[in-house]
Amino acid sequence: MTYVVGLTGGIGSGKSTVADLFAELGVSVIDADVVARQVVEKGSPLLAEIAEHFGEEILLADGSLNRTALREKVFADESQKQWLNQLLHPAIRREMLKQLAVQRAPYCLFVVPLLIENKLTALCQRILVVDVSEQTQLERANRRDNNQLALIKNIMQSQVSRAERLKYADDVINNDEDLARNLPQLKQKVLDLHHLYLQFAEIFNER
């Protein structure tokens, strides 16, 4: 069985950057955001169900999902968000577990933004949190998502607080610094954790 490190953090924390650095070291990465896109690909049964529920306006001209339109609908309405989560989360979980079952690497990274909120910590042997201040979250996500500040604040409110997330952490990467300046230090931190996780994985797999 593969040793599982759960990687999580709030919106704008830099989870994807950290996951990419692990991937560069040859670590297998199972990313919930990637899986979430796969399960609603154009022509999929789930996408058809979503379009039937919310209307054709959540589709782009080519028939694929308009993620921005869908996000705006669900984050403005708690009941709609719950409906979507009840549809998607089981499908995403099933697909991630399917990918995990075929892993043969010493350890893999389980990248899940809502790892704590969706009670997926039990699937992990260790939890790594990418931590930034709320101000950094807002600034980064606002730059990335073209000034959708109200939407970003809604997303942050739907996630556990920074303090709550850190309670679950076995390891923490502080990612508040500007990435361009901090990349060498970030790479070193990831490399150090990689060696640590290989040691833990060896012990885990000997049991």
From Swiss-Prot:
It comes from Aggregatibacter actinomycetemcomitans. Transmembrane segments: none annotated. Pathway: Cofactor biosynthesis; coenzyme A biosynthesis; CoA from (R)-pantothenate: step 5/5. One of its GO terms (cellular component) is cytoplasm. InterPro entries: Depp_CoAkinase (IPR001977), P-loop_NTPase (IPR027417). Disulfide bonds: none annotated. The keyword Chaperone does not apply. This is Dephospho-CoA kinase. Its EC number is 2.7.1.24.
